């Protein structure tokens, strides 16, 4: 996660499931450098978010030229960006880290769920197993291997990785600032409290953010996951996913 007074960025690195990536640096390195380069690329408010992302992707690629960036498992991440620009809010989402806007008593979730339509049978196979079991681990590796072949392709889904052309496939838009009370940019490890676990509503989420802040919200996620540590009630890839949230007020 990275932020300035006018910009909030959440990046969520994709799991390698223990498989090779063709990169000696790893996903945490990639996410950290992409965040820094994205902040730099968007320093000028008139730079479009998609152009800024493309520029950042190119810059990071140049930082590790000896790595195999064409490897389908090269380090990659989801991207969610919210920017205040004059009297509008610009947004960009690439993959499933959402931005949620609180607007006049309602909530608008901006997200890119193309990944959810990829290989549904293999996804279901993973979810048949409890986490931390050999069957789950093996099914997840098979799923990730197959998923990688569709990553950043017309028949699959798009993420930030070695090819800057992925930025052109991000979902973008703008909302008048006066229509939005506040907003949250988050990883899907947080949004699943609403979308998958269904133990809270967006109204609940924003009530927590307004009164107790992001730390309390993330603890709510962890407390919920602790009631189902092996994914029996809520089948998933891991017991607890990375959780990050930037709460935005103006």
Go through the PLM ranges and name each one.
Residues 1-250:
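PP2C/PPM-type serine/threonine phosphatase catalytic domain
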């Amino acid at each position: 996660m990275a932020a300035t007074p006018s910009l909030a960025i959440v990046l969520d690195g994709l799991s390698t499931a223990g498989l090779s990536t063709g990169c000696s640096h790893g996903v945490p390195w990639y996410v950290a450098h992409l965040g820094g380069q994205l902040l730099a690329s968007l320093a000028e408010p008139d730079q479009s978010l998609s152009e800024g992302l493309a520029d950042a992707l190119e810059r990071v690629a140049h930082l590790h030229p000896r790595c195999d960036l064409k490897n389908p498992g090269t380090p990659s991440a989801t991207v969610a960006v919210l920017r205040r620009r004059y009297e509008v809010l610009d947004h960009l989402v690439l993959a499933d880290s959402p931005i949620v806007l609180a607007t006049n008593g309602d909530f608008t979730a901006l997200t890119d769920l193309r990944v959810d339509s990829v290989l549904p049978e293999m996804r279901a196979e993973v979810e048949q197993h409890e986490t931390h079991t050999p069957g789950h681990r093996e099914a997840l590796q098979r799923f990730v291997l197959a998923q990688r072949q569709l990553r950043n392709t017309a028949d699959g889904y798009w993420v930030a990785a070695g090819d800057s052309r992925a930025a052109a496939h991000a979902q973008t838009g703008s909302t008048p600032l006066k229509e939005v009370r506040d907003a949250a940019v988050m990883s899907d490890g947080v949004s699943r409290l609403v979308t998958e676990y269904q133990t809270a509503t967006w109204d609940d989420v924003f009530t927590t953010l307004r009164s107790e802040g992001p730390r309390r919200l993330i603890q709510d996620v962890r407390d919920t996951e602790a009631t189902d540590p092996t994914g029996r009630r809520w089948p998933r890839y891991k017991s607890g996913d990375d959780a990050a949230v930037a709460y935005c007020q103006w």
